[in-house]
């Protein structure tokens, strides 16, 4: 399922969302800024999320993490490569031969595969809060964040309980000094729950991340212009990952954003919006 925000004559920008995120998670102020700058944002629900195709296996969150750390093979219904192929099929369906791509978190991992495998299809790549290696104790989420992510796998929670745990998570992984527990945010979470009630897709997407392993060799072959945006206090994907990506991608620029966690709150977006548009403008 996708949403083409237009305008029709704008330069297409494919937006690839992260783990457990629906297309509605892209901030409206970011969408508007892209449109106002002459771009045509196109967002979509990754498989197993939102209104896109669902799979049926029921892996457990903790068992997959334990298997990964113990180097035990992880069974997943699909890999990140399959999710990248979904994006290519969407571009083909929309008759888009070439576009920009912006990937957030897991969406950045998917986008790395996209631009490495299909460099002729993309003007530029923007990586936000993502990584090249598979998450591990040295570069991945803190134990506290893992516990909060694990809560999402709990079944039979009420709608209000799910909203409360979303507030706990974003308050932990977002920028400091920002009130995430607002009526507006709680309403947005409630609408997302109503749009897509199944949380098992989140666990299957996590299995795809852990089962794909790292992409060091593939990412080192990326040649298209790349902008790497990362928060200096990101507790989910540690800042060191941004420097690693920058080192591997020869044609890349690195922008570390002060007091940015793993979210794009409006004050955070205001800190990098000019650099983002400049990156897109000079690589059309």
What are the language-model segments listed below?
Residues 1-70:
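Conserved HGGG/HGGXW glycine-rich cap/lid loop of the alpha/beta-hydrolase fold
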Residues 81-99:
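Conserved acidic catalytic loop of the alpha/beta-hydrolase fold
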Residues 224, 238-245:
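Short alpha-helix in the alpha/beta-hydrolase fold that links the catalytic acid
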């Amino acid at each position: 399922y996708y949403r083409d925000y237009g305008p029709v004559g704008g330069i297409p920008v494919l937006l690839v969302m992260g783990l457990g995120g629906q297309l509605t998670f892209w901030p409206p102020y970011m969408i508007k800024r892209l449109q106002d700058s002459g771009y045509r944002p196109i967002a979509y629900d990754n498989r197993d999320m939102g209104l896109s195709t669902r799979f049926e296996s029921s892996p457990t969150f903790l068992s997959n993490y334990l298997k990964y750390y113990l180097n035990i093979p992880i069974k997943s219904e699909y890999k990140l490569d399959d999710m990248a192929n979904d994006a290519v099929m969407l571009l083909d369906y929309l008759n888009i031969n070439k576009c920009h791509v912006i990937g957030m978190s897991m969406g950045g991992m998917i986008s790395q595969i996209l631009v490495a495998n299909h460099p002729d299809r993309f003007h530029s790549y923007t990586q936000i809060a993502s990584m090249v290696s598979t998450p591990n104790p040295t570069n991945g989420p803190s134990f506290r964040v893992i516990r909060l992510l694990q809560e999402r796998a709990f079944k039979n929670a009420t709608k209000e309980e799910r909203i409360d745990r979303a507030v706990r998570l974003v308050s932990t992984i977002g920028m400091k000094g920002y009130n995430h527990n607002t009526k507006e945010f709680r309403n947005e979470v409630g609408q997302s729950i109503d749009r897509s009630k199944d949380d098992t897709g989140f666990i299957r997407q996590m299995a795809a991340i852990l089962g794909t392993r790292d992409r060091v060799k593939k990412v080192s072959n990326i040649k298209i212009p790349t902008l790497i945006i990362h928060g200096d206090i990101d507790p989910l994907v540690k800042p060191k990952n941004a420097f690693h990506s920058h080192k591997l991608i020869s044609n890349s620029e690195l922008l570390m954003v002060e007091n940015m966690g793993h979210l794009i709150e409006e004050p955070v977006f205001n800190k990098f919006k000019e650099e983002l548009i400049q990156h897109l403008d000079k690589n059309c």
